[in-house]
Amino acid sequence: MPEVKVPELAESITEGTIAEWLKNVGDSVEKGEAILELETDKVNVEVVSEEAGVLSEQLASEGDTVEVGQAIAIIGEGSGNASKENSNDNTPQQNEETNNKKEETTNNSVDKAEVNQANDDNQQRINATPSARRYARENGVNLAEVSPKTNDVVRKEDIDKKQQAPASTQTTQQAPAKEEKKYNQYPTKPVIREKMSRRKKTAAKKLLEVSNNTAMLTTFNEVDMTNVMELRKRKKEQFMKDHDGTKLGFMSFFTKASVAALKKYPEVNAEIDGDDMITKQYYDIGVAVSTDDGLLVPFVRDCDKKNFAEIEAEIANLAVKAREKKLGLDDMVNGSFTITNGGIFGSMMSTPIINGNQAAILGMHSIITRPIAIDQDTIENRPMMYIALSYDHRIIDGKEAVGFLKTIKELIENPEDLLLES
């Protein structure tokens, strides 16, 4: 019988976690229909069946880690049940038998309540993130009783809020879980223990790999933002009119400045592959986006060929896709350089960590008005920004790193030169 295997996703992705089965055993499956959702360190993807038939067997469970090419389901012949939801509604006897079997193994009323809640979850599709579904199962929470805070999507923080509500039933349900947890080193201190999401675990692993496998250094400079702020103030209204409402932000200036600096210092646009150094001849710039699930870095492709409006529009589009969990793998791989802006959170200075398979990352920070010596006799208040370049010293020498950052500074302080470059 045909097998469904974990598909090739991207060169850097070798495994994933089954977030949710969209089909039950016995359900009918159409060719090209999604049967499960797979969580990777970058995005969630739906795995589809290449054959029509019936889902005969699930070879892995929700929460299991599976590798690319691994068989995860078997598709048999027949018509099967209409859908996951209908299969539960149309077979009440099977549900009752399942409940009876589970009740035979325990007389605990809490376990019985959790079984009933699990059946309720199957009968009604709740709009929730995969991590929230898994978190709810682990903590015996009925998603139907959780009120989402934003966008009608249940998230982990909504479940936490539900659990913290003063209800005696919740206290009863949570008691056994607390007895099983082994964190009694400080029994008088309140703590919370929870499993890390796959994306969080992968990010932690990769950050540690970067720290261990690169000779990372950071160099700093400061930028006088006066001219670029004045130019933006003069042009922003006309810019929006000319480009269908696209706003002129600072990211397009720093992106175009980065492209110019990368052309001047090509080793910053490189990476090490074994004993070889690969210098990239393209300029796909990653823009870090903060989401509820952590930091994501989608890439704006071919920034050397795009104007300010195209870059701003694409950054805005990628940010929306990231927050709505609609990024594809094509948005997340094969970049050449990354820009991160800690200033939106109020950061004055930081040492950003290099993104995988890259040689450097540019860090932007808060714009702070402070006194600056213009010359020996003049001090003025100027809007200043600290910028940082973290780089792999195996590829980039200190002289080139300082020169790269100085080029960024000069172009931002003289934005007309950037317009001429474009």
From Swiss-Prot:
One of the protein's GO biological processes: tricarboxylic acid cycle
Assigned EC number: 2.3.1.61
Classification via InterPro entries: 2-oxoA_DH_lipoyl-BS (IPR003016), 2-oxoacid_dehydrogenase (IPR050537), 2-oxoacid_DH_actylTfrase (IPR001078), Biotin_lipoyl (IPR000089), CAT-like_dom_sf (IPR023213), E3-bd_dom_sf (IPR036625), PSBD (IPR004167), Single_hybrid_motif (IPR011053)
Residue ranges annotated for the Lipoyl-binding domain, each copy included: 1-76
Annotated Peripheral subunit-binding (PSBD) domain residues: 127-163
Annotated Low complexity bias: 164-176
Annotated catalysed reactions: N(6)-[(R)-dihydrolipoyl]-L-lysyl-[protein] + succinyl-CoA = N(6)-[(R)-S(8)-succinyldihydrolipoyl]-L-lysyl-[protein] + CoA
Cofactors: (R)-lipoate
Keywords (A to Z) from UniProt: Acyltransferase, Lipoyl, Transferase, Tricarboxylic acid cycle
Active site: H393, D397
Residues found modified as N6-lipoyllysine: K42
One Gene Ontology MF term: dihydrolipoyllysine-residue succinyltransferase activity
Compositionally biased intervals (Basic and acidic residues): 152-163
CDD domains (UniProt xref): lipoyl_domain (cd06849)
Pathway(s): Amino-acid degradation; L-lysine degradation via saccharopine pathway; glutaryl-CoA from L-lysine: step 6/6
Cofactor remark: Binds 1 lipoyl cofactor covalently.
GO CC, alphabetical: cytosol; oxoglutarate dehydrogenase complex
Stretches the record annotates as Disordered: 77-184
Compositional bias per record (Polar residues), positions renumbered to this chain: 80-94, 116-130
Subunit structure comment from the entry: Forms a 24-polypeptide structural core with octahedral symmetry. Part of the 2-oxoglutarate dehydrogenase (OGDH) complex composed of E1 (2-oxoglutarate dehydrogenase), E2 (dihydrolipoamide succinyltransferase) and E3 (dihydrolipoamide dehydrogenase); the complex contains multiple copies of the three enzymatic components (E1, E2 and E3).
NCBIfam families named among the record's database cross-references: PRK05704.1, sucB
The family this protein is said to belong to: Belongs to the 2-oxoacid dehydrogenase family.
Role, per record: E2 component of the 2-oxoglutarate dehydrogenase (OGDH) complex which catalyzes the second step in the conversion of 2-oxoglutarate to succinyl-CoA and CO(2).
Annotated protein name in UniProt: Dihydrolipoyllysine-residue succinyltransferase component of 2-oxoglutarate dehydrogenase complex
Organism: Staphylococcus aureus (strain N315)
Encoding gene, per UniProt annotation: odhB
